[in-house]
Regions:
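Conserved beta-sheet core of the metallophosphoesterase superfamily
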Residues: 138-201
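Beta-strand-turn-beta hairpins that frame and shape the catalytic cleft
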Residues: 124-141, 200
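Short, conserved, surface-exposed binding loops centered on an aromatic residue
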Residues: 115-117, 128-136, 162-167
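Flexible, charged surface loops at secondary-structure boundaries
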Residues: 19-23, 73-75, 135-136, 165-169, ...
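Short, glycine/acidic-enriched loop or turn micro-motifs at the edges of active sites
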Residues: 2-3, 35, 148, 180
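Short, structured patches in soluble enzyme cores that scaffold and shape functional sites
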Residues: 83, 129, 143-147
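Short beta-strand scaffold segments in enzyme catalytic cores
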Residues: 122-126, 183-184
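Core catalytic region of metal-dependent phosphoesterases/phosphodiesterases
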Residues: 3-119
Length: 201
């Protein structure tokens, strides 16, 4: 999201989040919820890339507190946030955890039905569905924020292929970091419960 960066398209973001609320969907974020690059010890920082409302002596606090207010309408839908390189960079340089602070303050302030769960830089998510009163299904996601560059031509697909090749048991491999948007279906051969060869997407 890089929510606090002036280049974040807040109108488009709000449109997507409002649609999630309308559809009763769960909102999950795979890292880089914040940008937070304009602090004192960040060599990438540039004060022209900071919103006026965040240009304060307590820059990190201002961003976190503003985000807690801005995301309030999505309190009962925003259920998971993982770390990205922007958040881990703040933890490394400033010895404070911006996501933990956001999640704790958000959950305390808005008291959502299901508190936001703070994940890691990578991990597993299992989403459970109940299509009817007697049936239960699950969908397993292996998430990893990502690392390295995406590549002008490949758009990060090579990293996804590597991740998928070393991951077993996931219905979906979810990566971010390279600022590209695509979905890729990979068909694999496997055996079903009766040891019959099948193809699975």
């Amino acid at each position: 999201l890089h929510w606090d960066n002036p280049k974040c398209d807040r109108k488009a973001l709000k449109r997507h989040l409002d649609y999630a609320v309308k559809e009763g969907a769960v909102i999950m974020v795979n890292g880089d919820f914040f940008c937070l690059m304009q602090g004192k010890y960040d060599p990438r920082g540039n004060k022209k890339d900071i919103l006026p409302e965040h240009n304060k002596a307590n820059y990190i606090d201002a961003v976190i507190e503003d985000a807690v207010d801005w995301f309030a309408p999505y309190a009962n839908h925003l259920q998971f946030i993982g770390y990205g390189n922007h958040e881990t960079n703040i933890l490394k340089r400033l010895e404070t955890d911006p996501l933990r602070r956001f999640v704790d303050l958000f959950n305390y302030t808005h008291k959502p039905e299901n508190p936001i769960c703070l994940g890691g830089y990578g991990g597993w998510l299992t989403v459970q569905f109940k299509p009817n009163a007697t049936e239960r299904k699950s969908y397993t996601i292996n998430y990893f924020h990502g690392s390295g560059g995406g590549g002008i031509v490949t758009k990060g697909v090579i990293q996804n292929q590597r991740r998928d090749a070393m991951t077993e048991g996931a219905d979906c491999v979810w990566m971010g970091h390279v600022h590209e948007l695509y979905t890729m279906v990979v068909t694999k051969q496997t055996l079903d419960r009766n040891r019959v060869p099948i193809l699975k997407d």
